[in-house]
């Protein structure tokens, strides 16, 4: 029944987005929403500091006129996912409601006190160095650490080969260390660890209706075969499956459908972060939007190791 409801909502929102005018005036500080121009600026900032993320165009027929043709959405590929959400230690005491006043019961940070980055942890890691400026440590160095760490095995987007959209780019993680790690685990008898290793391609698009970024993800198993919807749901916090996270068509790419983190609460969560920073005497620039965005959506997909921005300083 929930799938039917989500499908109906999805179709209605497609129409609503089509009819919604493009936001021209910045309302970031007041409401947490951003214009397409601000989305591009935040995307440029993310790509500069974390080059595993890259801009992409997608299908020519799906290009949005309100975004630059070469900057339709952001993508990072072959992101490792070593275990399922059910394998994480969990109890009700670790749960925190981020948004209380919505009809769906709030944005739930399931691993609020476990060290997994969520909305509260994101704010805690913000250090206000002055009232007039915000500084960001060189995140690119953190991104480069992936070349030294053992990650998950690589995966290709085989579904897109015939469309001509599959190409090698800088957004693809270096997976040589991933393979070496898997081999080492095999020699040590860790076969289960290999079978559990998955990889994901993640995308960030601009949602014209909600006027916020939107996260999309599509996964592959250790044999580089696309995961089923049920398998992808295993890597998503069960508090968000079929609620915050639904299966929908990517606005810039051909099928298959992907998991998408619904953006209906993004602006309100961002507004709370802006207020928290302001209470500490600082000011959150709109260029930081996607770095913060990647922090609070990790509460939804805590086992996917995409977040290389967790140690930035403000």
Swiss-Prot record:
Motif Caspase cleavage motif LETD: where in chain: 166-169
Motif Increases ATG3 translation efficiency by the ribomome assisted of EIF5A per UniProt: ranges: 101-103
Subcellular location per the Swiss-Prot or TrEMBL entry: Cytoplasm
Active-site residues from the entry: 264 (glycyl thioester intermediate)
Residues with N-acetylmethionine modification: 1
Entry GO CC: Atg12-Atg5-Atg16 complex; cytosol; phagophore assembly site
Keywords: Acetylation, Autophagy, Cytoplasm, Isopeptide bond, Protein transport, Transferase, Transport, Ubl conjugation, Ubl conjugation pathway
Region (Interaction with ATG12): 140-170
Residue segments, region Disordered: 143-167
EC number(s) on file: 2.3.2.-
Motif stretch (Membrane-curvature-sensing motif): 4-19
Record-marked site positions (Cleavage): 169-170
Bilayer-spanning residue ranges: none
UniProt motif LIR motif: location: 104-110
Modification(s) after translation: Conjugated to ATG12 at Lys-243. ATG12-conjugation plays a role in regulation of mitochondrial homeostasis and cell death, while it is not involved in phosphatidylethanolamine-conjugation to ATG8-like proteins and autophagy. Cleaved by CASP8 upon death ligand binding such as tumor necrosis factor-alpha. CASP8 cleavage blocks survival-related autophagy and favors apoptosis.
InterPro entries: Atg3/Atg10
Biological-process GO terms, alphabetical: autophagosome assembly; autophagy; autophagy of mitochondrion; glycophagy; mitochondrial fragmentation involved in apoptotic process; negative regulation of phagocytosis; nucleophagy; protein transport
Positions of crosslink type Glycyl lysine isopeptide (Lys-Gly) (interchain with G-Cter in ATG12): 243
Class of this enzyme: transferase
Family note: Belongs to the ATG3 family.
Function field: Catalyzes the covalent conjugation of the C-terminal Gly of ATG8-like proteins (GABARAP, GABARAPL1, GABARAPL2 or MAP1LC3A) to the amino group of phosphatidylethanolamine (PE)-containing lipids in the membrane resulting in membrane-bound ATG8-like proteins which is one of the key steps in the development of autophagic isolation membranes during autophagosome formation. Cycles back and forth between binding to ATG7 for loading with the ATG8-like proteins and binding to E3 enzyme, composed of ATG12, ATG5 and ATG16L1 to promote ATG8-like proteins lipidation.
PANTHER family xref list: UBIQUITIN-LIKE-CONJUGATING ENZYME ATG3
Subunit organization: Homdimer. Interacts with ATG7; this interaction forms an E1-E2 complex that is essential for the transfer of GABARAP thioester from ATG7 to ATG3 and disrupts interaction with the E3 enzyme complex. Interacts with ATG12; this interaction is ATG7-dependent, essential for phosphatidylethanolamine (PE)-conjugated ATG8-like proteins formation and also mediates the autoconjugation of ATG12 on ATG3. Interacts with FNBP1L.
Name of the protein: Ubiquitin-like-conjugating enzyme ATG3
Organism expressing this protein natively: Bos taurus (Bovine)
Gene field: ATG3
